[in-house]
């Protein structure tokens, strides 16, 4: 009788262990969509406008979830704020202007969690300076002695010293305002020119009654200022603790970006789904302008989507150190790493030139 009990106990013990092992094996083999997804919080640089489709598309199409990620995407209020919030740990990742990231690094050398850029999205800065033709401004040098307007944190305003040096522009005066008033003040004649993103301010000027043919636009990238624009940045804590999640994020993002660049009109549906009050046709134009001017630009095609040229990055670090008068010099190796980028084939997302 005792032997029989022992036999039964032994059988059930072995059976229980076998079931537990089988369950563990099934969990290991289960697809990422079945396992608990890794939560990631991402903040954009600005509102949900056309270019946000690059991030909303992979959410809408399930690319992030299929990669085992639960991505929360929030609008931003400027690159500087996004950099600060990733540094504080409020967000894991974000989209921010490379110059803003460099400025944060150089002004906060002892900060413990300085974000790092891990994929370039806007290969060229979207910064530009605008004027109305009625002002008589025809070349960048004509801004000498003029009154310019922009928010104090505007990327073009902060990098104005570089643009002025490259184009031999004399002293100018600045008027500060909140972003919604920038284009209004130019149309009213309160200022002679404004700085802003090329695909934002032009459309805003049109919305305020100006005609595109009556606006003079000088993109920084086409006038001697080859700064990088917005990049995906990440918390070093995330990079250290979950590098595989970072790699999965960038791979899924690249997949979505390829779809957006191939069919931008269709991709705006993802933006409309997130913000139902957008003007669809306006945001289609904005997205296409961003693609042409900063995402699939000649420089982006030469360097490859998502990547940077080390020499160009080093030059930018030096330029930002000077123009922004940072406390310490920017170390280009500290602000960028290509270690998490997808393969070359997965980064082949740019549409054929001319399309």
PLM feature spans:
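Surface-exposed patches in mature extracellular/periplasmic domains of secreted proteins
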Residues: 74, 117, 174, 260-270, ...
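Pocket-lining segment of extracytoplasmic ligand-binding domains
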Residues: 99-100, 108, 181-280
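Secondary-structure end/capping motifs
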Residues: 241-325
